[in-house]
Amino acid sequence: MTKPLEGRIALVTGASRGIGRAAAFAFAEAGAHVIALARTTGGLEELDDEIRAIGGSATLVPADLADAAAIEKLGPALLERWGRLDILLANAGILGPLAPLTHVSAKEWAEVFDINVSANWRLLKSVEPALKASESGRAIFLSSGAAHKGLAYWAPYAVSKAALEAMARSYADETRSTNLRVMLVNPGPLRTRMRAQAMPGEDPMTLKTPEDLAPHLVEIASPEWSETGKIFDFPQGKVLTPQMPA
């Protein structure tokens, strides 16, 4: 029986833990060769062991998305080695400070935007030739419901995710006539380290896990997926079209 991602090449950022780790494992289980990128070498090595244990394969890339020079070299290196990139899962991000908007320092504000927005822009620029070399390229960006709610004390994170959504939708429109499909994913509250950091009083056992989300990411990453420029909302279990003013 053919696996849904058989033979596909997938790059996953933030792959050492949480959603990225669960997605990387699920992609490998579905037949993809996973290029796992994260800052944490130990976490990547554990992921590699798990993937190999199920007969999958992975390439580990210990790197920081904030390292612009390293990210600039990544896309050409992927293209040279594999000739294409079928799946980009841009998952890595940071929460930043949870504080009144005007109490956030310029350094903190810039750091959140650099990782959550600018690093993803640089990454997309770097891997675009490899994505477009695929017969069915998929660019998937992890967003958040915070981008739409205007939550008190969440401004840096919320604004950065709103900007990421605008970037992804713009790119989806630019590539609409190509084989590339661009999707956003709102995972909702999941049992992750970032969620525990943001909501320390919450019982994590009441939340779904990254492993619950992963099969949906496999579906979006598959060659059969046809939607572009939309948001898969995991809490609702459906694809949403952003409501744009006329």
Predicted features, each with a name:
Residues 32-46:
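Conserved glycine-rich Rossmann-like NAD(P)H-binding loop of the short-chain dehydrogenase/reductase
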Residues 99-101, 108-113:
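Substrate-binding pocket helix/loop in short-chain dehydrogenase/reductase
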Residues 144:
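Residue(s) in the substrate-gating loop at a strand-loop-helix junction
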Residues 129, 172-174:
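Alpha-helical segment proximal to the catalytic Tyr-Lys
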Residues 9, 16-18:
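Conserved glycine-rich cofactor-binding loop
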Residues 124, 160:
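Active-site helix of classical SDR
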Residues 177-180, 184-185, 192, 200-246:
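C-terminal helical subdomain
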